[in-house]
Amino acid sequence: GLPLLRLGGAFVLSGLMNSGCEFLIRAFLNHQGDLEVVGLLNAGITIVFVYAGMVFSVMDQDFYPRLSGISGSRKNEESVKERNLCVNRQLEMNVLLLGPIVAAIILGLPIIIPILYNAQFMGMLQMTQLAAVAMLFKAVYLPIEYLPLSRGDSRLFLIQESFCVILLIICEIAGYQLDGLRGVGGGIAVAYAIETIAVLIFSRAVYGYRLSALGFRFCIFQLLILLLVLFLVFMISYRDWLYWLIGVIIALMSTSFSFRKIRKLVR
């Protein structure tokens, strides 16, 4: 009962830290900018993290029970291999599914924003496009972050979460100081990229986790696709037909790659 209580407490504290992070960021933006900036940030975050986050909720429903069901200590070689396999399979599927979705969101935001809100919210377009890249990094690190929880290591989980929260606050504030609202989106993407690297290093040291070669290749391909998409959206106006032609081609490349790889994985 006590380990379960500690785990529940870790979840609650993690939620409080994330809520505190959001409050601090919004208070800073309200002080440095105005309520309009805060409103645009809230709207952009809702599109990226709430709507795209629903995909994570669906995919992770059966992952945590499977990971928790693997017995054995951190040092048990067979258990480490089994956990690595479980995490890597989930990570690979996350990246393959989220890659095309994020690419489509970034490309389609000029249409999505007026539909969900109105044309007055187009000021958050570039910020939201940059922040959306963070979803690919989240697809990578989220399955790995479950390792402390699956082992009942609530203290390590909280240390990990504390680092991530502090990093996000620093990157968002620095981004706003450098490039206004658009910089906040870039700061979010940078924070998630650093978090991914930190989680990989931490999990390698503590749990013996190793990212699979296949997962690494999937990550690199989908990241290059998103960088190509960002180059497109910042170089060509969405009012130009070339934007949509090239955008559809890039999105189809990502979708085709993911579809072929998923078919191989599920066989």
Can you say where each PLM-predicted feature lies in the sequence?
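Juxtamembrane helix-entry segments on the extracytoplasmic side of multipass membrane proteins
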Residues: 2-6, 39-42, 119-129, 242
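Membrane-proximal transmembrane or re-entrant/amphipathic helices at the cytosolic face
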Residues: 230-267
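Alpha-helical transmembrane segments of multi-pass membrane transport and lipid-handling proteins
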Residues: 55, 59, 84-138, 169-177, ...
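Helix-loop junctions and terminal segments of transmembrane helices
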Residues: 44, 48-95, 145-150
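Residues that define the loop-to-transmembrane-helix transition and helix capping
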Residues: 36-39, 88, 122-125, 154-155, ...
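Short runs within selected transmembrane alpha-helices of multi-pass transporters and secretion channels
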Residues: 14, 18-22, 45-48, 60, ...
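N-terminal membrane topogenesis motif
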Residues: 1-14, 84, 88-92, 257-267
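Transmembrane helical elements of multi-pass membrane transporters/channels
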Residues: 1-69, 134, 138-142
